[in-house]
């Protein structure tokens, strides 16, 4: 509990919004230690905006050196987190600003992803310069619009742990002669799925950026089926691992999802589809296995989801170092000059080894006002090289008549024959020019 008698001071507040990510505690630690070094009191706010937007200032505590000195090694968040959204109602935003004022908080550090950043920008706007807000970008999705290839903190730890899990699944796949369909967390972008797939050399990776618009589940199944047939036909291997970004679901028609037995569509406080509640891995496993069973072709698929086990992992050294710099940078900006209505909020980033501060407005979509999403750029050498090492049906497979004959033969069974022309008609539409760096 914060001493109300001291609430008039210019305190530093810190809160966490959105899902967990490795490194959160390191940010809290760096912010607290640097603020205390500058003789500022630090108020830790529990559960994001959840209580502040109700006008409840009791879920806070003062943070001292001993509270944070070793927490940077640990996953999770000592302040917890929540997806409470104060931007839906102006009354909620007003209560947030009033609550911060009651706590004597003139400087607020928010830790979170795109939604929390948008909420932070609105708090800064509604405070009219009375509260300065600095946002520290956090998400294992890596989808905040930071310049260039700069990752959000937590991403590299999530990729490392995810890669270790997929590496184990690849060995299990080889040992047991099975396929694994691994769906990886990533609401709007395929950075994590592609990062894991490329690092491990998974058989193939599927990300939403491959599809310019809506995508059908049947198309995803066609890609997977084609990859399985090609691997069997050309290398005589009945095993493999497909890494699939859960964000594909965002581009599937809700009507198509609703038609799938057992699927229930719900949304979170920010209006996003609750992707983890739609088991894409199981849906794909069931549909692809059915395709092979209908032709009496043997296929064993295991479905696996990777996401929650990555979010609260202990951060690797990269993220431990990274978040210390970000936390310091947040305090450096917050306490550097007096806030004004025009200069009251920013995002802290490390660009070319230097601390930079990006205005909230520069990170927002001009049409919606919401935070822009950074997606995988599929026309880059990085993505095209990743495609080079995947096993998928490509244009050259249909240009080579002998290879096409072998592929068609792999898709055939005594129960259902497949001619080269039928194979071409069935799968050629999947081919692209995305393979190989240019």
List the predicted regions and their residue ranges.
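Gly-rich Lys/Arg/Thr-decorated short loops/hinges at beta-loop-alpha junctions or inter-strand turns
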Residues: 11-14, 71-83, 138-150, 175-177, ...
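Accessory alpha-helical/coil subdomains and C-terminal extensions
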Residues: 99, 107-112, 118-122, 126-134, ...
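Short, ordered loop/turn segments at secondary-structure junctions
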Residues: 17-19, 40, 45-50, 83-84, ...
